[in-house]
Amino acid sequence: MQQYLDFMRHVLEHGTEKTDRTGTGTLSVFGHQMRFDLQEGFPLVTTKRTHLKSIIHELLWFLQGSSNVAYLREHGVTIWDEWADPDGELGPVYGVQWRSWPTPDGRHIDQIAQVVEQIRRTPDSRRLIVSAWNVGEIEQMALPPCHAFFQFYVADGRLSCQLYQRSADIFLGVPFNIASYALLTLMVAQVTGLKPGEFIWTGGDCHLYTNHLEQARKQLTREPRTLPVMRLNPDVRELDGFRFEDFTLEGYDPHPGIKAPVAV
């Protein structure tokens, strides 16, 4: 994950000071891309410990199409609590848009089921897209989608995925997002009978919060270690069939965690 460290160093050296919605302040650059070959290991940052349990449960929660944090809380995952109302509701966030995008005539579109079927039937399609950025419902969301749009691509029997992330919290959020979408790519590849290809991360406003700068500098003093391997239960053949116990991470030997506050 040297390219992640290089990205962080680039923002520290060349970022522009900007204000932001949270009032924290950032160093920011506009536009960046990283590519990860999923045959070379699972792209989980090794220069600090990353909480895989939260990553897996959040992705499964997205795939459930839920707008409530009850499932996350049930499994000890609190990453969405800051934005939930007293009843645990978040409005029509990621999972709702992925699994139940509303149409003007009152129907709902399951984008995930649709894209999996498209990959199986028409793998050369240029429309293998899922979007969480529903302009008509942004105001109802507790937090508008940061990772807003992703596209699959099939070539030579391999499935690749590219994510566009409009707003990228480089220190806390981006390692999480890379691992989440890399995992989704592995899952979709398995259920469509393909091998994993690349995960491509593309960012818009890429920023380090000013209260993360010292932590970022500390992380840059550490040497990346060998990437781990993610094993999926080969018996799972449908995306909705995955459960937490179907994922096994092997060979993860990270440096210790580095704490940093979340900007809300």
UniProtKB/Swiss-Prot annotation:
Annotated residues for binding of (6R)-5,10-methylene-5,6,7,8-tetrahydrofolate: H51, D169, A263
Active site per the UniProt annotation: C146 (nucleophile)
InterPro entries named among the record's database cross-references: Thymidate_synth/dCMP_Mease (IPR045097), Thymidate_synth/dCMP_Mease_dom (IPR023451), Thymidate_synth/dCMP_Mease_sf (IPR036926), Thymidylate_synthase (IPR000398), Thymidylate_synthase_AS (IPR020940)
GO BP term, pick one: methylation
Gene3D superfamilies, per database record: Thymidylate synthase/dCMP hydroxymethylase domain
GO cellular component: cytosol
Entry-linked CDD domains: TS_Pyrimidine_HMase (cd00351)
Location of the protein in the cell: Cytoplasm
Binding site for dUMP: R21, R126, R127, R166, S167, A168, D169, N177, H207, L208, Y209
Enzyme class name: transferase
A Pfam family that the UniProt record links to this protein: Thymidylat_synt
Domain of life: Bacteria
Pathway this chain belongs to: Pyrimidine metabolism; dTTP biosynthesis
Function summary: Catalyzes the reductive methylation of 2'-deoxyuridine-5'-monophosphate (dUMP) to 2'-deoxythymidine-5'-monophosphate (dTMP) while utilizing 5,10-methylenetetrahydrofolate (mTHF) as the methyl donor and reductant in the reaction, yielding dihydrofolate (DHF) as a by-product. This enzymatic reaction provides an intracellular de novo source of dTMP, an essential precursor for DNA biosynthesis.
Subunit structure: Homodimer.
Family the UniProt entry places it in: Belongs to the thymidylate synthase family. Bacterial-type ThyA subfamily.
Protein's recorded name: Thymidylate synthase
Organism: Deinococcus deserti (strain DSM 17065 / CIP 109153 / LMG 22923 / VCD115)
Organism classification: Bacteria, Thermotogati, Deinococcota, Deinococci, Deinococcales
